Every structure is written in C-alpha cells, then in structure tokens.
Amino acid sequence: SNRPMPLNRWQFKNMISCTVPSRSWWDFADYGCYCGRGGSGTPVDDLDRCCQVHDNCYNEAEKISGCNPRFRTYSYECTAGTLTCTGRNNACAASVCDCDRLAAICFAGAPYNDNNYNIDLQARCN
C-alpha cells in the first residue's frame, strides 16, 4: 500500500536509525511474523519477539482514553545512540514513546536474519 506513513511511524523510524544506524528502518518494516504487516503466530526469532512486545505495548497504550499509538507523536531525544523520552509528553505520548524506545533498543540487541525478511505469513505465522 502507498498510504502516507503516520507521523508516529516516522518518529519510530528515526528512533531505529538512532539505535541501529547500520541498517535501514525498511529492514524492520517487513520482518518475521510481527514486524510490519503481521501480528499472529509464534515469533520466528528474538528480533521478531521485539516486534511482538512492541505490538502488545501499543495495545496497552490504547487503553489510555483517546490514545491512538499509531498516530500519537511524542517528544524524545537521541544522543550518541541513547534514546530518551522527554518530560513534555502527556500520558498517551509518554506510553507510546516508551513502546518505541524499548523496541528500538531491542532491535539493536537482536541478531538480524535475512531469511526472516518478507516471509510467507500464511505458511509461517498461523
């Protein structure tokens, strides 16, 4: 689909660039069962598990009244590869920022397996 990217996705992409400067954010946009379009089945590896946790984190944030994680922008800083959610966020923004921050840190610590990029969701994620 060529819908415009939600602003929050743009911020998340920049967070990933902060913690994993060696890779394009695009490498994480269609990985395993949970990174990007998926959201079911058993995570294929640690990186995919990062995305499953991120999905669950967004689901928790949605419980905050009026909070839509996919469109909620937030205030954060990247300093030498370290992400900080700043104090200017309301409850929703703070939650979403932390979801994205923790995922970006998780991505940095997880091995990337090229075989798990753009997998067959039907076959592997039931």
UniProtKB/Swiss-Prot annotation:
<feature type="active site">
    <location>
        <position position="100"/>
    </location>
</feature>
<feature type="binding site">
    <location>
        <position position="34"/>
    </location>
    <ligand>
        <name>Ca(2+)</name>
    </ligand>
</feature>
<dbReference type="InterPro" id="IPR033112">
    <property type="entry name" value="PLipase_A2_Asp_AS"/>
</dbReference>
<feature type="disulfide bond">
    <location>
        <begin position="18"/>
        <end position="78"/>
    </location>
</feature>
<comment type="function">
    <text>PLA2 catalyzes the calcium-dependent hydrolysis of the 2-acyl groups in 3-sn-phosphoglycerides.</text>
</comment>
<dbReference type="GO" id="GO:0005509">
    <property type="term" value="F:calcium ion binding"/>
</dbReference>
<comment type="subunit">
    <text>Heterodimer formed between two homologous isoforms: isoform 1 and isoform 2.</text>
</comment>
<keyword id="KW-1015">Disulfide bond</keyword>
<comment type="similarity">
    <text>Belongs to the phospholipase A2 family. Group I subfamily. D49 sub-subfamily.</text>
</comment>
<feature type="active site">
    <location>
        <position position="54"/>
    </location>
</feature>
<dbReference type="GO" id="GO:0005102">
    <property type="term" value="F:signaling receptor binding"/>
</dbReference>
<dbReference type="Pfam" id="PF00068">
    <property type="entry name" value="Phospholip_A2_1"/>
</dbReference>
<feature type="disulfide bond">
    <location>
        <begin position="67"/>
        <end position="92"/>
    </location>
</feature>
<dbReference type="GO" id="GO:0047498">
    <property type="term" value="F:calcium-dependent phospholipase A2 activity"/>
</dbReference>
<keyword id="KW-0479">Metal-binding</keyword>
<protein>
    <recommendedName>
        <fullName>Acidic phospholipase A2 2</fullName>
        <ecNumber>3.1.1.4</ecNumber>
    </recommendedName>
</protein>
<dbReference type="GO" id="GO:0006633">
    <property type="term" value="P:fatty acid biosynthetic process"/>
</dbReference>
<feature type="disulfide bond">
    <location>
        <begin position="57"/>
        <end position="99"/>
    </location>
</feature>
<dbReference type="GO" id="GO:0005576">
    <property type="term" value="C:extracellular region"/>
</dbReference>
<feature type="propeptide">
    <location>
        <begin position="1"/>
        <end position="7"/>
    </location>
</feature>
<dbReference type="GO" id="GO:0048146">
    <property type="term" value="P:positive regulation of fibroblast proliferation"/>
</dbReference>
<feature type="binding site">
    <location>
        <position position="36"/>
    </location>
    <ligand>
        <name>Ca(2+)</name>
    </ligand>
</feature>
<keyword id="KW-0378">Hydrolase</keyword>
<dbReference type="InterPro" id="IPR036444">
    <property type="entry name" value="PLipase_A2_dom_sf"/>
</dbReference>
<dbReference type="GO" id="GO:0016042">
    <property type="term" value="P:lipid catabolic process"/>
</dbReference>
<dbReference type="GO" id="GO:0006644">
    <property type="term" value="P:phospholipid metabolic process"/>
</dbReference>
<keyword id="KW-0106">Calcium</keyword>
<dbReference type="InterPro" id="IPR016090">
    <property type="entry name" value="PLipase_A2_dom"/>
</dbReference>
<dbReference type="InterPro" id="IPR001211">
    <property type="entry name" value="PLipase_A2"/>
</dbReference>
<feature type="binding site">
    <location>
        <position position="55"/>
    </location>
    <ligand>
        <name>Ca(2+)</name>
    </ligand>
</feature>
<feature type="disulfide bond">
    <location>
        <begin position="33"/>
        <end position="125"/>
    </location>
</feature>
<keyword id="KW-0964">Secreted</keyword>
<feature type="disulfide bond">
    <location>
        <begin position="85"/>
        <end position="97"/>
    </location>
</feature>
<feature type="disulfide bond">
    <location>
        <begin position="35"/>
        <end position="51"/>
    </location>
</feature>
<dbReference type="GO" id="GO:0005543">
    <property type="term" value="F:phospholipid binding"/>
</dbReference>
<dbReference type="InterPro" id="IPR033113">
    <property type="entry name" value="PLipase_A2_His_AS"/>
</dbReference>
<keyword id="KW-0443">Lipid metabolism</keyword>
<dbReference type="GO" id="GO:0050482">
    <property type="term" value="P:arachidonate secretion"/>
</dbReference>
<feature type="binding site">
    <location>
        <position position="38"/>
    </location>
    <ligand>
        <name>Ca(2+)</name>
    </ligand>
</feature>
<keyword id="KW-0442">Lipid degradation</keyword>
<feature type="disulfide bond">
    <location>
        <begin position="50"/>
        <end position="106"/>
    </location>
</feature>
